[in-house]
């Protein structure tokens, strides 16, 4: 059987000499892995993580790993490797996709969201965009946070906390008696205009980190690339 799609290469692992297994996040078919051969300098350039490609997958049976062929559409590599923050953010994002998105599981609209993020990241790193990507990944895996209104009173003002149980925002008055048991809702997630302080970055990463660990990563074993990114942002970024 054959599958043709457009996708982003998110993983490349050596199999044997000049042969690799790539994983591609496709537009219409979810994650797909296939064996590729690098027979020239051109093919080495094509099969790089972050490249957007026309993707052809062929196998006798659907459950086989299959043979893959790609044609390059666009490469972001040159924009990412020259900036440590961009590179760490990119590595973190694709490591999360590999961990949280299952092979051949379709996610509607996720591909366009990923493309938009990569395009923006290639131009400039934005912490707000990064956190929104993590929140989107949580939502795509079934753990959407509702930060638009208070989960108790439904008011949309003075939102200050997030309940670790319901994943819903809480107003200051509702959450105050239980503040030691609640997560902080960073102000920048409520307004596109506000500047982001280092403390708010810490709060945001703590927020997504909590739900990643509670629902998706056993024994708090997150991808090393995300840990590297978080450490860099909180100490350098």
Swiss-Prot record:
It comes from the Bacteria. SUPFAM superfamilies: ArfGap/RecO-like zinc finger. InterPro entries: ARFGAP/RecO, DNA_rep/recomb_RecO_N, NA-bd_OB-fold, RecO, RecO_C. Keywords: DNA damage, DNA recombination, DNA repair. Gene3D superfamilies: Nucleic acid-binding proteins (2.40.50.140), Recombination protein O, C-terminal domain (1.20.1440.120). One of its GO terms (biological process) is double-strand break repair. GO terms for cellular component: bacterial nucleoid. Belongs to the RecO family. Involved in DNA repair and RecF pathway recombination. This is DNA repair protein RecO.
